[in-house]
Amino acid sequence: MKILFVAAEGAPFSKTGGLGDVIGALPKSLVKAGHEVAVILPYYDMVEAKFGNQIEDVLHFEVSVGWRRQYCGIKKTVLNGVTFYFIDNQYYFFRGHVYGDFDDGERFAFFQLAAIEAMERIDFIPDLLHVHDYHTAMIPFLLKEKYCWIQAYEDIETVLTIHNLEFQGQFSEGMLGDLFGVGLERYADGTLRWNNCLNWMKAGILYANRVSTVSPSYAHEIMTSQFGCNLDQILKMESGKVSGIVNGIDADLYNPQTDALLDYHFNQEDLSGKAKNKAKLQERVGLPVRADVPLVGIVSRLTRQKGFDVVVESLHHILQEDVQIVLLGTGDPAFEGAFSWFAQIYPGKLSANITFDVKLAQEIYAACDLFLMPSRFEPCGLSQMMAMRYGTLPLVHEVGGLRDTVRAFNPIEGSGTGFSFDNLSPYWLNWTFQTALDLYRNHPDIWRNLQKQAMESDFSWDTACKSYLDLYHSLVN
């Protein structure tokens, strides 16, 4: 099968979050499964700086962006058997960052038009075209409404993956003519209109042949008013083509037996290296070096979406216990200040590292006993899977991908891979935390068994790839 991905970011070239991880890993797994895979990404200035000498020029042409003609260069490189094509236009993509400009609508309108017109020119007409989030969600609409006259594109099947429904691409309806060069008919009849705006995500949901999300629970949640971001009715209407597939993690990169960022390696049969990493981390962040105290890790953006309003409200209670917490992350200044204040009040119990450090993050995943992740909503989440890979048990709020990946501790069977609570409140966070502390202190054999189950969980991309192939084969025989 010929499969083409079109996305706004993709590791290792450009990455701001989970979308970049998916684009970096899923195509590689599909190639290993015997398929021909290509990816189209914007050619950002950070790509030029880091990978420019590995990328070759292929061709260039002009793209009509409304009444304007814009330069489009095509560049190319091959990595892990995947052919990466880049759309080059310095005016749109040399901004020093991926997102956040006032003209993001125009930037990604150009990108989508250029990606579609590039397919013929690079001679890669896919059987299946996989687009991601609102930045590329107009492509299924454009294929059926603007480029339907191109015979080579007639049989292309499309899949839209929603990584985060919060970001929908809502713009003035004038964009349809001014940038995309199409009429207002589909806006006037309500197909593309939502809240009196052009809504790219709605267009993708309606026009794509299949819609996927990054976990089964999130697929169900976005059909409710609580998580649907005002598109829940549209998703309910299209529910027959909506499904969820849990993201994977790179099992080779996140491997406690070989991780180059760790001082000591270990496996599920011998955790002595984990204990040494714990002592090393305690020393590094200025906490008393104690093997007996439970060490709790947090690696996250410090935002309300991640549940840190509830964590801050609970901290006084939690820190009355004989525990240590090491936090790594940046975000809302109010949360940054709160954690810094608590670190001063409880210097031997809380280390607040208001920054981001890849090596320190890896050490936290590997060295801690518990990993706290009480997200208000979480489409998939990767941190909890990374933590389990290293035998660090997650304590999570039961939403989205957290519900799908963390098996809550069952005290009757002594089974599970972590701890979870259903109601996001300080009371239930504290109650679940006490359950975990009791198990750690009084039932070490059961704790050890949970660690083993967590480390044996399969979150590899090869497993996720099989689910995506089932989805693709439902469209392409």
UniProtKB/Swiss-Prot annotation:
Q: Which GO terms describe its biological process?
A: glycogen biosynthetic process
The answer to whether the entry has keyword Cytoplasm is no
| Pathway the protein acts in | Glycan biosynthesis; glycogen biosynthesis
Q: Provide this UniProt record's keywords sorted from A to Z.
A: Glycogen biosynthesis, Glycosyltransferase, Transferase
SUPFAM superfamilies associated with the record: UDP-Glycosyltransferase/glycogen phosphorylase
Q: What is its EC number?
A: 2.4.1.21
Positions contributing to ADP-alpha-D-glucose binding? 15
* Keyword Protein biosynthesis set for record: no
| One MF annotation (Gene Ontology) recorded for this entry | alpha-1,4-glucan glucosyltransferase (UDP-glucose donor) activity
The reaction(s) this protein catalyses:
[(1->4)-alpha-D-glucosyl](n) + ADP-alpha-D-glucose = [(1->4)-alpha-D-glucosyl](n+1) + ADP + H(+)
Matching CDD domains: GT5_Glycogen_synthase_DULL1-like
Q: What does this protein do?
A: Synthesizes alpha-1,4-glucan chains using ADP-glucose.
**Which NCBIfam families does this entry report, sorted A to Z?**
glgA, PRK00654.1-1
Q: Which PANTHER family match?
A: ALPHA AMYLASE DOMAIN-CONTAINING PROTEIN (PTHR45825:SF11), GRANULE-BOUND STARCH SYNTHASE 1, CHLOROPLASTIC/AMYLOPLASTIC (PTHR45825)
Family membership:
Belongs to the glycosyltransferase 1 family. Bacterial/plant glycogen synthase subfamily.
> Know the name of this protein?
Glycogen synthase
Q: What species does this protein belong to?
A: Streptococcus pneumoniae (strain ATCC 700669 / Spain 23F-1)
**Taxonomic lineage of the native organism:** Bacteria, Bacillati, Bacillota, Bacilli, Lactobacillales
